[in-house]
Amino acid sequence: MIFAKGHGTQNDFVLLPDVAARLSLTAAQVAALCDRRRGLGADGILRVTTADAAVAAGVLHRLPDGVSPGDWYMDYRNADGSTAQMCGNGVRVFAHYLRASGLETRDEFVVGSLAGPRPVTVHHADQTHADVTVDMGKANKLGPGEAVVGGRRLSGVAVDVGNPHLACLDPGLTPEQLAALDVGAPVSFDHAQFPEGVNVEVLTARAAGVVCMRVHERGVGETRSCGTGTVAAAVAALASAGQETGTLTVRIPGGDVTVNITDATSLLRGPSVLVASGEISEEWWRDQRR
């Protein structure tokens, strides 16, 4: 069983090319593969398939709204084995892999997800590096919320980016204080407001068009980056200045991305790196089913 390993601003993934969607992919197998000691190690799994194949194989019960049968489909799983609606960094890496592997030759195409279609533009791609913009769709502000992160109580803005986020901007937080915050510890939030959990971003006030951010992803813990989280952070940073639209650089531990919030949509541009490829032992894979 072949695989590739890649990352988008150090949010890392194992890619499993499975165009016909024939691969068994249990929660236990995903968790084992993502384990950094007994598996390959990753923040998540990206199964590379098509929307019609995913439906035919029962991976999807039906096509997500706006996704066409012939679209590529990113079957994304969190490191704990749960299914996730969207991952902006994952879409960039997914699109990069399609180009690098020769499965796709176009510069512009659509990647389907549980959250709907995500059009991508590949500005550059070689076997190792790529620069990709993802149309993330409209990010919707849902209202205020609160979280406790690393013992610090924070107020934030709930944002739907195809998955739930609580982006907490603390105007008194310096980049140095943000770096020292224990974002990896369990976070507290209102479970009535977020019954399926929430991704929590902590960010500084913007300075010279840049905001610094760290994120605790549901089902994973702290990651070096979160694409949808950077969009939520940009929405919150703009809102704090009384703005609905604008372009910001979001600086996460894994690097910088550019987020453009418009009236109609949100655009996420950033790098992708393909690190390795190889084969997973079939015997090991079978042993992880239980």
From Swiss-Prot:
- Signal peptide positions on this chain: none
Highest taxon, organism lineage: Bacteria
Q: Which GO terms describe its biological process?
A: lysine biosynthetic process via diaminopimelate
Q: Please give the Pfam families that the UniProt record associates with this protein.
A: DAP_epimerase (PF01678)
Amino-acid positions noted as binding substrate in the UniProt annotation, renumbered to this chain: 11, 78, 88-89, 163, 199, 217-218, 227-228
Site features described as Could be important to modulate the pK values of the two catalytic cysteine residues, chain residue numbers: 165, 217
- Enzyme class per UniProt: isomerase
What SUPFAM superfamilies does this protein's entry cite? Diaminopimelate epimerase-like
Per UniProt, the keywords (alphabetical) are:
Amino-acid biosynthesis, Cytoplasm, Isomerase, Lysine biosynthesis
Any one Gene Ontology molecular-function term assigned to this protein's record: diaminopimelate epimerase activity
Subcellular location, in the record's words? Cytoplasm
Active site, renumbered: 87 (proton donor), 226 (proton acceptor)
The record's Gene Ontology cellular component field reads: cytosol
Q: What InterPro entries does this protein's entry cite?
A: DAP_epimerase_AS, DAP_epimerase_DapF
The record lists the catalysed reaction(s) as: (2S,6S)-2,6-diaminopimelate = meso-2,6-diaminopimelate
**Protein family according to the UniProt entry:** Belongs to the diaminopimelate epimerase family.
Record's protein name: Diaminopimelate epimerase
Q: Which organism is it from?
A: Mycobacterium ulcerans (strain Agy99)
Taxonomic classification: Bacteria, Bacillati, Actinomycetota, Actinomycetes, Mycobacteriales
